[in-house]
């Protein structure tokens, strides 16, 4: 069975006013279909930066060096593309349809001035051919699936109206979308 995700010798550095910060050094791993990989480590050990790199979400001052980053057998390292626009278009498709990340802090990810329903519906509208009504129903179903009580009512609430655990479940629902 072929790897779904393969990362070979990933290194991530950040340029700062104080010099170079080495966030990730020579990390390699593979994930096969139906397999779950947990990345654990101390705070600041590079777990998030590793995954931001794989998903093409690294900050502008970050630099990735990798022998290979493959998703479903295709190179997804930016150097494999003709230009940044082509890379971004490919990654946007992969992120929306094939790969998702559950962020550690939901309040960093959720927009405080947008209703939860709006934030759940947006990725569905961007990455599916469903109508707005179908997207709304799917969002309600996803909320129900992750254990959010009264999802129809919750669609019209803001992130601050949710407990920390419920906000985390909304992020999981978005990843499932």
Annotate each predicted stretch with a short phrase.
Residues 1-177:
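ABC transporter nucleotide-binding domains
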């Amino acid at each position: 069975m072929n790897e779904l995700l393969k990362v070979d010798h990933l290194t991530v550095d950040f340029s700062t006013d104080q010099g170079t910060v080495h966030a990730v050094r020579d990390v390699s791993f593979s994930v096969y279909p139906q397999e779950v990989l947990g990345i654990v480590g101390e705070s600041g050990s590079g777990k998030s930066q590793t995954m931001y790199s794989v998903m093409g979400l690294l900050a502008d001052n970050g630099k990735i060096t990798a022998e290979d980053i493959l998703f479903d057998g295709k190179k997804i390292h930016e150097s494999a593309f003709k230009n940044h626009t082509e890379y971004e278009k490919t990654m946007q498709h992969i992120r929306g349809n094939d790969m998702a990340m559950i962020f550690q802090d939901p309040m960093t990810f959720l927009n405080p001035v947008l209703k939860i329903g709006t934030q759940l519906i947006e990725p569905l509208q961007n990455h599916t051919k469903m109508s707005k009504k179908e997207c709304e129903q799917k969002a309600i179903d996803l909320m129900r699936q992750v254990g959010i009580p009264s999802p129809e009512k919750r669609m019209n609430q803001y992130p601050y109206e949710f407990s920390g655990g419920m906000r985390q479940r909304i992020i999981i629902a978005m990843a499932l979308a």
